């Protein structure tokens, strides 16, 4: 298949083409599946034969919620697309827990920065070639990758990726400073090659009848695992900021994608921002206001907050007791000793779309579906939208 993308973007269509009837409602979702392994090829090997317990649970969750378009975070990337095919054909398209099989005719897959060596000692531990020295933390290229599945056609020719965008090119970038010297934390050689995106930022155009919706997909770095310089917190902030600038024509001219196209979304374009943003609006360790760059943006429809009853019951002791945010909006079950459960996964439509319903897949303890929750420490978040 020909593609203008040199970075091996795959539009996989192993299923015969099937028309999607224009529907009044489109369900978008994001789900950090934790389908990552510590060795390249290990996930693909595990998926062979359809017997992975974790993957079967992930597939059943998807079959229960049945999103039309879903971003999956933390699915190890392989350039052949074999891992995706195995998950789709041997898990999603096979009934799990008596749920109807789920078919996605369109898949978007592209490389990510995790595990790609930078050649520089980025974490300043005296060694190079370690996971913390990659452009995004990872033990091999593609660990913690991303994947988009869609019932609606994907306009591959108009898809854009920002995997290689340099952090220093962002005006006013929050590049870290060494508090002990007030000097830049990263040496000039590191700043010269440092990529903003810890995985990647994708603009995936979804063709819904005569309308186009841009799925803006990413997975910013966790704002922890660093020191007083807060290098990961600052990067997380600016990874989120990329989308806040991208959706505003007056702020996006500095952005250049991996194929040299400048600028962001056209004025009036429909979009849905999705992903594990690793940022809670009130709690956790993020730079203050990080996710507010999106939640408070007038182009974003963020009033209806996805919620669940199960999350309330999971609000245990420890760090959760001091949280300011409502437990019903949490999307991740993190350790009680810290940071506690947080709202870090988002599906944020543009105001040009009408939000009908939303939710978080977090069934209360005791319900049969609660047995699926140990498949990941994150919960699937979904939002139903329609055109105004």
Annotate each PLM feature.
Residues 147-150, 202-205, 216, 346-347:
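Conserved hydrophobic/aromatic positions in well-ordered beta-strands
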Residues 153-161, 165-171, 205-206, 232-273, ...:
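Metal-dependent phosphoester-hydrolase catalytic domains
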Residues 1-9:
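Bacterial N-terminal signal peptides that target proteins for export
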Residues 157-160, 165-216, 233-235:
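Catalytic-adjacent loop/helix segments of enzymes that bind and process anionic phosphate/sulfate esters
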Residues 21-148, 174-194, 209-213, 226-228, ...:
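N-terminal, active-site-proximal structural segment of metallo-dependent hydrolase catalytic domains
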Residues 33, 74-75, 152, 220, ...:
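Active-site metal-binding loops of divalent metal-dependent hydrolases
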Residues 8-17:
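Bacterial N-terminal signal peptides
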Residues 199, 222-223, 227, 238, ...:
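Beta-propeller domains
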């Amino acid at each position: 298949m020909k593609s203008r993308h040199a970075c091996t973007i795959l539009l996989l269509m192993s299923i015969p083409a099937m028309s999607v009837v224009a529907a009044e409602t489109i369900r978008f979702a994001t789900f950090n599946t934790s389908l990552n392994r510590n060795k390249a090829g290990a996930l693909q090997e595990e998926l062979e034969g359809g017997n992975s317990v974790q993957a079967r649970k992930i597939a059943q969750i998807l079959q229960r919620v049945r999103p039309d378009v879903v971003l999956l975070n933390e699915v190890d990337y392989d350039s052949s697309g074999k891992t995706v095919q195995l998950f789709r054909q041997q898990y999603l398209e096979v009934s799990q827990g008596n749920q109807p099989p789920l078919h996605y005719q369109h898949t978007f897959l592209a490389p990510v920065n995790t595990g790609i060596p930078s050649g520089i000692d980025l974490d300043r531990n005296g060694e190079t070639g370690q996971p913390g020295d990659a452009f995004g933390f990872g033990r091999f290229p593609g660990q913690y990758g991303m994947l988009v599945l869609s019932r609606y056609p994907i306009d591959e020719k108009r898809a854009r990726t920002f995997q290689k965008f340099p952090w220093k090119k962002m005006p006013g970038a929050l590049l870290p400073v060494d508090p002990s010297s007030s000097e830049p934390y990263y040496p000039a050689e590191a700043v010269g090659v440092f990529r903003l995106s810890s995985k990647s930022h994708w603009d995936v155009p979804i063709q819904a009848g005569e309308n186009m919706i841009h799925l803006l997909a990413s997975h910013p770095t966790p704002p922890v695992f660093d020191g007083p310089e807060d290098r990961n917190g600052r990067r997380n902030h600016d990874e989120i900021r990329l989308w806040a600038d991208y959706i505003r024509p007056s702020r996006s001219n500095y952005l250049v994608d991996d194929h040299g196209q400048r600028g962001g979304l056209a004025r009036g374009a429909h979009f849905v921002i999705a992903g594990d943003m690793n940022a809670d609006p009130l709690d956790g360790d993020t730079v203050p206001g990080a996710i507010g760059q999106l939640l408070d943006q007038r182009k974003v429809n963020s009033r209806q907050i996805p919620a669940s009853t199960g999350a309330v019951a999971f609000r245990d002791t420890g760090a959760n007791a001091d949280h300011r945010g409502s437990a019903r909006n949490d999307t991740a079950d993190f350790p009680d000793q810290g940071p506690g459960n947080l709202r870090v996964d988002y599906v944020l439509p543009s105001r040009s779309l009408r939000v009908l319903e939303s939710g978080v897949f977090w069934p209360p303890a005791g319900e049969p579906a609660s047995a699926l929750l140990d498949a990941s420490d994150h919960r699937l978040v979904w939002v139903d939208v329609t055109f105004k």
